């Protein structure tokens, strides 16, 4: 027997007693609580029976049984709504700027508790080849699934799988919308953050839509905005570009309102009753040239 075979046999011999101990504790009913089960799982990792990712996934599955939908939902203030009277171009701009695939649709901008349906972004694709005048948003809406904040996350996952839907609107005890939850939100509790092609851009807060236009999150730091657009907005009184826009207006502007600051045009593309969410910034040619000159010098 060579050394490699001997080492392999020794490794197998050390694993067998652990396996026997592990399964023995399962089948003999020695595990009395969750803490003991977690201990066994972590022992399994230390003995190289499972890797770190597997251990974290197992623990994630165990943890979702203790979570409620309110613990993982996207809060109401971060939901991007579409109004059922918006035209095709407005809907497309909202979809492009947010990079989401599903949107709650409301009948009245001042009543966000009255959600009339869910719009799937893919349902708009056919209108790119058809006459926009035949566009009827109401005909594209999917049914709304309503769930209470107190619903258990593991039951929510079961419903997502069995009923084959991916988004639910979360309401509080009074029936008011408090947030939304997606199947991705639950899966991230199990496997960790799921990054898609848009996540890096969302983290950056600023996303270029065309040569002259940018989608900018209202929470973008003024310093980051200045660095991107070669501006010198003061951050002594406010920290974010959304705060600066509100300060300049003197009130909370509604979606669609515009203002020009330092040759840049700011348009509110998403807002709720408490804060700004998303802005569209249009850069004129002369300022674009200044931005390009700064980029060339930095290189």
Swiss-Prot record:
Alphabetized InterPro entries for the sequence: CBS_dom (IPR000644), CBS_dom_sf (IPR046342), CorC_N (IPR054115), FAD-bd_PCMH-like_sf (IPR036318), FAD-bd_PCMH_sub2 (IPR016169), Ion_transp-like_CBS (IPR044751), Transptr-assoc_dom (IPR005170)
Top-rank lineage group of the source organism: Bacteria
What are the GO MF terms of this UniProt record? flavin adenine dinucleotide binding
List UniProt keywords, sorted A-Z.
CBS domain, Cobalt, Magnesium, Repeat, Transport
Describe its function. Plays a role in the transport of magnesium and cobalt ions.
Family annotation (PANTHER family): HEMOLYSIN-RELATED, MAGNESIUM AND COBALT EFFLUX PROTEIN CORC
Q: What is this protein called?
A: Magnesium and cobalt efflux protein CorC
GO cellular component terms attached to this protein's record: plasma membrane
């Amino acid at each position: 027997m060579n050394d490699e075979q001997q080492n392999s046999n020794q490794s197998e011999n050390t694993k067998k007693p652990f396996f026997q101990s592990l399964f023995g504790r399962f089948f003999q009913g020695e595990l009395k609580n969750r803490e003991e089960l977690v201990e066994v799982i972590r022992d399994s990792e230390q003995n190289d029976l499972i890797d770190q990712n597997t251990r974290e996934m197992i623990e994630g599955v165990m943890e979702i049984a203790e979570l409620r939908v309110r613990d993982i939902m996207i809060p109401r203030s971060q939901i991007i709504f579409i109004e059922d009277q918006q035209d095709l171009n407005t809907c497309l701009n909202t979809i492009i700027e947010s990079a989401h695939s599903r949107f709650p649709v409301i009948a009245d901008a001042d009543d966000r508790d009255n959600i009339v349906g869910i719009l799937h972004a893919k349902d708009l694709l056919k209108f790119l080849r058809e006459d926009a005048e035949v566009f009827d948003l109401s005909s594209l809406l999917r049914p709304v699934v309503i769930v209470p904040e107190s619903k258990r996350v593991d039951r929510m996952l079961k419903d997502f799988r069995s009923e084959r839907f991916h988004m639910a609107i979360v309401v509080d005890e009074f029936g008011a919308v408090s947030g939304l939850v997606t199947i991705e939100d639950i899966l991230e509790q199990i496997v960790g953050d799921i990054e898609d092609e848009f996540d890096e851009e969302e983290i950056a807060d600023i996303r270029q839509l065309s040569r002259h236009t940018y989608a900018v999150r209202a929470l973008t730091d003024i310093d980051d905005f200045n660095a991107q657009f070669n501006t010198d907005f003061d951050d002594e009184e406010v920290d974010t570009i959304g705060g600066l826009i509100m300060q300049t207006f003197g009130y909370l502007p509604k979606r669609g309102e515009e203002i020009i600051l330092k040759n840049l045009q700011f348009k509110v593309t998403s807002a709720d009753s408490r804060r700004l969410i998303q802005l569209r910034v249009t850069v004129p040619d002369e300022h674009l040239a200044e931005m390009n000159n700064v980029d060339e010098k930095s290189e």
